[in-house]
Amino acid sequence: MSVQDVLWIVLTVQLSFGLAYFENNQRTQDYDVDKNGSVHHKNWVRNEMMDSLGLYWLKWWINANENSIYFEVTVHTRGFAGLGFSKDGRLARADMVLMWVDDATGHPNVLDCHGALHPSSGPPLQDDTQNYDVLDGKQNGTHTILKFKRKIETCDPFDIPLSADTFKVLWSIGENDPIHGNLDWQGQSRGVKALQLFSPMFTKNSHSIEGIQKWDITVNNVTIDRSMDTLYWCKIVRLPELTGKQHIIGYEPLLSGKYERNVVHHMTLFECQSKIYSGSDPSSWDLWVRSAGTVCNSNLLTPRDWDSCSTPVAVWSLGSDGQFLPPHAGIPMGGASGVSYYMLEIHYDNPDGKESVDHSGFRIHYTPNLRTYDSGILISGVSISETQLIPPGQKKYRSVGICGPSCSSVMFPKDGIKIISGTLHSHQAGRTISLRHVRSGKELNPIIVDENYDYRHQKVHQLANETVVLPGDYLITDCSYETKYRKRPTFGGYSTKEEMCLTFITYYPKIEMSGCYSMTPVREFFEMFRVYQFYSLNMTDVENMFLYNSDYTDYSKQAKNATNKPNSGKTSKEDVIYQESLLNKLVISDPAEFHDRTFLSHLNQLPWHDPLFTKRVEQAFITGTHMTFCRVSKDSLSIPSEIIRYPEFTAYVKPPAACLNYLFTDNEELRSGSSQFFTDFTLSLLLLIQLGLQTTLL
């Protein structure tokens, strides 16, 4: 037997231990049902395998009465284990804990630490105040298990307050117990995993659910050429032969190749309504099933019938593990639904210009054992269009997408829909995203908030408490972006260098609606920048190009071309996006002071460096008019679009932080030990100043 065979056996045994531990430590989740029928999950427990081999398992749950979070770590070592919480995945400024069971005494140890302030400043530093309480610890010949807890907010400037945001959870495994005074984090294995600590997670437990079947849907030999920066590929598939209605209970990604090198950015599986257009040939669908697929959203290559593939049933984005639904909900398939065909859409992002061949897709888990409710997925947010504009050089700039009464009053049932979960989606510039909820002129608690959004880690936000959205309510997807190092405006679009602002909402009961979007009306978008007319194109033509993806050449035979200076340097992929932009083809005729400029050139000359100007533009887009769209499953656009103003409402105010000390966690001068005096002195000084101001006012 070779050394490789022995290593493989060892790894297999370790992974089997980990999976067995996972299966045996899943606590049945209790729940309450309120007067509105919403489910509130309680006593939930999360269990995550932190590495790919099952060497490190992290289990946790929240005790709301104590305002505490409990952890249990099971690690394949008799040495130390490290755990840390970070906003960006770096050791610097991370909130960390080192733990071990003493080999000599059997005593469990948990040490509260923090990362150095600079990446090159050495090992972790011990906190002055220890805020982690060890509860239990033991080890055998191979494994160490430690249980401990901490407050969600500790009021220690060197700890990070935990929240519903996406955290980068650091982990490390060491072969030996730490030597006194040596807090070196660099163990034999270490890594980072993005987690949402406040979200329960549902799983497919093979011991308790019978009759689960799987349906694998993948593309076949899709070639991503070196020259392709962005590719959207669509493939039609047919539903398997089923005996009546079934319920999809969850789905997982099937990714070809090593994950780190994979170019798949996101995937969506859509239902198709095969009889939606008059003149459609039903036999064409079976021909498309046998084909390899084609480029999506192409006027030349994509069949018009594929526009009917609009209702999502599975959504995956970079960093996600997929989703399993709670036990009372399932997405229907087969039976009387009339849906026989589905479309798999895959977005390939290839910034490094590598050639690859892909076979990715979904594994759908379904069962004939129907659940209580039919569930669905709908998309809400900003309609993907170049009328979404993010100026360059911005630390924080917001865009909003509105789903208003034109959809909710018409499509939602009397008792509303109940939101189970949501996946927030933007591209590289996205920094924070929230799904806001407005009813009767008052903003309610946000449904989902992620103030540490990372487009590389787009996990499902599973709600511990389902949210009821009633007819007449507003859903607002609110995104903020950072473009500090960009020199030109960023627009809405399909490339990761362009932007999106979307929420994929999983809910029940299922309704015949696939999407609810808004955008700045086209005419108002141009008038915002004092542009009123283009050569040989009236504004109606321009609106049609934006709203219906019409080809510019259909309207531009007499259009005047602007004189653009040739690019003498190397053309980047961003340059290509700008050159192909519709905004770069529209040449201004009115007003005269801007004539013969392309609209894109006009935007590049605006004073984006002026914060007052940029803030006015941001507020004008947010609080101005919005064109809303309600996409209904049974028709391509059966509810007319509507132009509305941003709703007036009393905004939700986030409760103040319990601890002022957290305001100083990013201070470059903050140090352990003597720095506590500096922190306390500064807080006291601020308090005295505030009291002095109050006295003056009195």
From Swiss-Prot:
UniProt-annotated binding residues for Cu cation B: 425, 427, 500
EC number: 1.14.17.-
Signal peptide boundaries: 1-20
Catalytic residues of the enzyme: 232, 425
Domain DOMON: 54-174
Sites carrying sugar chains: 36, 140, 221, 465, 538, 561
Keywords from the named record: Copper, Disulfide bond, Glycoprotein, Metal-binding, Monooxygenase, Oxidoreductase, Secreted, Signal
Keyword Metal-binding: yes
A Pfam family matched in the record: Cu2_monoox_C
Disulfide bonds: 272-309, 403-516, 479-501
Intracellular or extracellular location(s): Secreted
CDD domains cross-referenced by the UniProt entry: DOMON_DOH
The keyword Glycoprotein belongs to this UniProt entry's keyword annotation: yes
Cofactor binding description: Binds 2 copper ions per subunit.
Binding site for Cu cation A: 265-266, 347
Cofactor section: Cu(2+)
UniProt record similarity statement: Belongs to the copper type II ascorbate-dependent monooxygenase family.
Protein name according to UniProt: MOXD1 homolog 1
Originating species: Drosophila melanogaster (Fruit fly)
